[in-house]
Amino acid sequence: MDRADLTSIPAQQQAWPGRTAELDPQPDHGEQSWVGRGRLEGKRALITGGDSGIGRAVAITFAKEGADVVIAHLPQEAEDAQDTVELVRAQGRKGEAVATDLRDAKANRELAAKAVELLGGIDVLVCNAAFQMTHDEIGEFPDEQVVRTFETNVFGPFWLTKALEDELRDGSIIITTSVQAFSPSEQLLDYAATKAALNNLAVNLAAELGPQNTRVNAVAPGPIWTPLIPATMSEKKVDGFGSDTPLGRAGHPVEVAAAFVFLASDEASYVSGTVLGVTGGKPIF
């Protein structure tokens, strides 16, 4: 992993939802850099937004640690999703993909049932799917975008957790929040609000599901180099993305995936109700 590549990301832009192959520089998802140690041996994981970026890195590292994986993705992301499935299967683990849009309760119930059918059960749920678009001021945020952002980012994890509550007894739920929940950017007004809501949801769920030994935690990434960035931000904002962190660079997806592996593993058996920041030094308090 060449971290120096991410100290000066050049200006670039993609059509939404973005493609991994078009990113410059190419991000590290752990394809070669991650060495598994059997920390998730035999576990079965459902990862939403698993086609690219953080979700792809979580899928790859989980597979390298011994887990079977189902990823959920939008139909528009089928090409990236298939690449991720092949990377999972290359580790000798079961990998499947389900195309869906998780903006309504029915779609989440159907995904839950399909994932259980494909893997025979679910031990780890990773709620990672997210939507964002940037605008310079509140008047520029279209109503339909705000609704979509909340439906995808907040309602989806709520409904999916509800559908898998019984399956996840003695299991683990990990929700992707963001440094934006703690230090919001005006250009991400709706997105930042959803991530703050997810922090609250994670803590609340940890309290409610603790008696059935379901651990619930959240990971709050900082600026991570994924297709979402050039697909939702202007070229000007992409130029030098992440260089404002104390570490002076954006993060690779695999650097965030390490937090998910820890929280899904037995090493985190007494960790629940927490938000773990992977932010390059940006504060999350």
Predicted regions and their residues:
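Short C-terminal tail/terminal secondary-structure segment
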Residues: 6-10, 23, 31-32, 135, ...
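C-terminal substrate-recognition "lid" of short-chain dehydrogenase/reductases
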Residues: 158, 167, 249-278, 283-284
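Alpha-helical segment proximal to the catalytic Tyr-Lys
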Residues: 166, 207-211, 269
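Active-site loop-to-helix junction immediately N-terminal to the catalytic Tyr of the SDR YXXXK motif
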Residues: 141, 184-192, 204
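Active-site helix of classical SDR
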Residues: 161, 194
